[in-house]
């Protein structure tokens, strides 16, 4: 038995009641160092036999390595290295004009630094601390940059990732949040995609960091000329997202939704920046796509109902 929160549709209130374990569990707890997450981890370990709609997704480095194994995805993955020493960072900067240094398990744009190479010995850094406070842009010599990065990393595990040119003419960064979910037929389906524009001086586009959401097509129009070409880019992004979702589910285990953070350059090439297993839905409300928001809420329930009927049906 569990002491569950039960919704009363007549009173429109929630209350605690003792109930037997549910037939299906939809895990929406975000990965974070907290007592609640530790409780969830112990629960999943103890009751591993229960039916979960989704399994925890692994860290960013592991997901990158999994996707890299499939040749279909390689051209869509920014080159990424584990930040084991500052040599990893400078090796990337030898090949790309800018890179991002990000925590292996970070969310919400926290703890991300952008490094741009200005000359052989001079670099421009910008970032966002773990509390989401923006670090103003500053120029550092190579030796000082090394010290800064080692202090920034501390005892944590970080990645160094190829930077993609995602600045708009006004200097703000942008990307796209693509949500794919299982539908009522048990198939992966595109729920929606919204554009995100970062706050002034921010190196990330996250909404919690001061960014705002817009409709995908209007943001694409700022960099891609021609409606036909924009639709082609959108179809490519959707097809890639669906293929990645199916591949990760096949490799890792049960999943019912994924949000992919995508960068699209001026040539229309799509890059996968991150894959998020427990995404928020507010990006669709903010962008004005209320229908995508409605679908984002309903689809997991429709998939759960389909899965329940399928597992409860007597085998022939």
PLM segments and residue spans:
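Conserved N-proximal alpha/beta basic substrate-recognition cap immediately N-terminal to
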Residues: 1-88, 107
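A short alpha/beta connector and helix-capping loop motif
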Residues: 112-120, 274-279, 290-291
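Short acidic-glycine loop/turn motifs at beta-strand connectors
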Residues: 116-121, 182-186, 265-268
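Glycine-rich phosphate/pyrophosphate-binding beta-alpha loops
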Residues: 196-207, 276-288
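Charge-rich, low-complexity intrinsically disordered segments
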Residues: 279-316
């Amino acid at each position: 038995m569990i002491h569950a929160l039960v919704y009363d549709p007549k009173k429109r209130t929630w209350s605690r009641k003792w109930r037997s374990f549910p037939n299906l569990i939809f895990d929406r707890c975000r990965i974070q160092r907290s007592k609640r997450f530790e409780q969830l981890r112990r629960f999943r370990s103890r009751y591993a036999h229960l039916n979960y709609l989704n399994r925890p997704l692994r860290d960013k480095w592991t997901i990158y390595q999994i996707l890299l194994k499939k040749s279909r995805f390689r051209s869509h993955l920014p080159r990424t290295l584990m930040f084991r020493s500052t040599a990893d960072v400078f090796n990337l900067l030898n090949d790309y004009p800018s890179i991002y240094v990000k925590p292996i398990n970070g969310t919400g744009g926290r703890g991300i630094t952008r490094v741009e190479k200005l000359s052989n010995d001079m670099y421009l850094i910008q970032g966002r601390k773990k509390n989401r406070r923006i670090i103003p842009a500053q120029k550092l010599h190579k030796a000082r940059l090394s010290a800064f990065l080692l202090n920034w990393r501390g005892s944590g595990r970080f990645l160094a990732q190829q930077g993609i040119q995602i600045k708009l003419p006004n200097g703000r960064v942008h990307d796209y949040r693509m949500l794919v979910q299982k539908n009522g037929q048990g198939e992966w389906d595109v729920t929606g995609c919204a554009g995100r524009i970062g706050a002034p001086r921010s190196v990330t586009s996250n909404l919690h960091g001061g960014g705002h959401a817009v409709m995908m097509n209007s943001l694409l129009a700022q960099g891609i000329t021609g409606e036909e070409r924009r639709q082609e880019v959108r179809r490519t992004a959707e097809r890639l997202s669906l293929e990645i979702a199916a591949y990760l589910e096949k490799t890792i285990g049960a999943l019912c939704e994924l949000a992919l953070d995508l960068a699209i350059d001026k040539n229309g090439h799509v890059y996968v920046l991150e894959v998020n297993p427990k995404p928020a839905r507010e990006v669709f409300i903010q962008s004005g796509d209320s229908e995508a928001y409605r679908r984002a809420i309903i689809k997991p329930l429709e998939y759960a109902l389909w899965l329940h009927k399928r597992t409860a049906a007597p085998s022939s």
